[in-house]
């Protein structure tokens, strides 16, 4: 381990310049100094010449002074990995932030490492059921794939990701890692207690400080933290997921909320590091930064990492460079649409915009594929007719088109579903629907078997049988 020492010569917000007398530390090396009696980690970003390196601080730099001694650790930032991390909340550098003592570990892993080579990658396609109708039918998720949840502010990305954690992590029984990147601290706190209440994690206060039996590790770098922490926290979480995949041969779930904040933090740092910005003010290395993270999230012959990433879409503009760059890496995209949430249909998933690489007959089966395409066809036809309806009214449509519109409105409402995590808002208990029941229900609506039921019966129900019961209840109330 190198113990080369330097001293701070300049501090510009989250960027700190350090001068060394001897050998300069390598790019991406971690340096350590003290600030207010706490260890502050710096990561080398640039060699400036004249024996000076420019570094990024992983915590607040208030109180740092020029001349303070800095030590080179001789390697990248290392974080604790292994079963001891499960049930704990850690910072970007692996420090505990849940007031439950040190994180027990037998080894540490670097947050920077190369992606698995071609010959280590696995390519089988297997569907990962989620219990959410619109997802399972129209944009099914692949086990070991990368999934993106796209949406503007307040359309339900975090609620959907929490429901996926609830549905998949509970049924799944494997290990999960949750990286909270630049999101609200309140949401992180809610998630932590929700996991304890649902039995996914154990409360250390009730088990003498132990979290044994927990199944999810949490790594947080929240909105109020410096850009250095937000730009690296996803990598810290990924290092833990890679340990479970490579060393223990597990299938791991890796949740990131929100991948846009990773890009945003990189953009802030890029300006502080003096790089010339590219389109819309983003860093010129946007695609490289994203690729370095995404290429490591993959399935190998040892185990798999299935990742679910929430992607904030600035001003609902899908062509913005940040979401557009993320699109290229994903196997399935679930697009949340404000117009759908305004109709009160939740989850507000856009059935025509959401896609999946594995929605093909060879993988999901002929019946599922055919039903999904028919549903999209009906909704597309309804969308095309909306201008005519707005100008001339429903009466001007042909009988066939009237039938299409009626079925489309039923399909639209049947795509809604009550969520477990939203029960406190809606008062309705959450429902998970098996894939076979989802396909059966939508096929029956497309075939016209339920043309006689009112469209209100299809809103916020689980299976098609629930819709029939709701229709009977509505009829009884109206009588």
UniProtKB/Swiss-Prot annotation:
- Single GO MF descriptor: ATP hydrolysis activity
- PROSITE patterns from the entry? ATPASE_ALPHA_BETA
User: What InterPro entries does UniProt report for this protein, alphabetically?
Assistant: AAA+_ATPase, ATP-synt_VA_C, ATP_synth_F1_bsu, ATPase_a/bsu_AS, ATPase_alpha/beta_chains, ATPase_F1/V1/A1_a/bsu_N, ATPase_F1/V1/A1_a/bsu_N_sf, ATPase_F1/V1/A1_a/bsu_nucl-bd
Q: From which domain of life does this come?
A: Bacteria
Which top-level enzyme class is recorded in the Swiss-Prot or TrEMBL entry? Answer: translocase
One cellular component (GO) term of this entry? proton-transporting ATP synthase complex
- UniProt KW keywords: ATP synthesis, ATP-binding, Cell inner membrane, Cell membrane, CF(1), Hydrogen ion transport, Ion transport, Membrane, Nucleotide-binding, Translocase, Transport
Where does this polypeptide localize?
Answer: Cell inner membrane
List positions binding ATP: 151-158
Q: How does it sit in the membrane?
A: Peripheral membrane protein
The EC number(s) attached to this protein equal 7.1.2.2
**Catalytic activity annotated for this protein?**
ATP + H2O + 4 H(+)(in) = ADP + phosphate + 5 H(+)(out)
Would you identify the family this protein belongs to, as annotated?
Answer: Belongs to the ATPase alpha/beta chains family.
Its subunit composition reads: F-type ATPases have 2 components, CF(1) - the catalytic core - and CF(0) - the membrane proton channel. CF(1) has five subunits: alpha(3), beta(3), gamma(1), delta(1), epsilon(1). CF(0) has three main subunits: a(1), b(2) and c(9-12). The alpha and beta chains form an alternating ring which encloses part of the gamma chain. CF(1) is attached to CF(0) by a central stalk formed by the gamma and epsilon chains, while a peripheral stalk is formed by the delta and b chains.
Q: What does this protein do?
A: Produces ATP from ADP in the presence of a proton gradient across the membrane. The catalytic sites are hosted primarily by the beta subunits.
- The protein's name is ATP synthase subunit beta
Source organism per UniProt: Maricaulis maris (strain MCS10)
Provide the gene name from the record: atpD
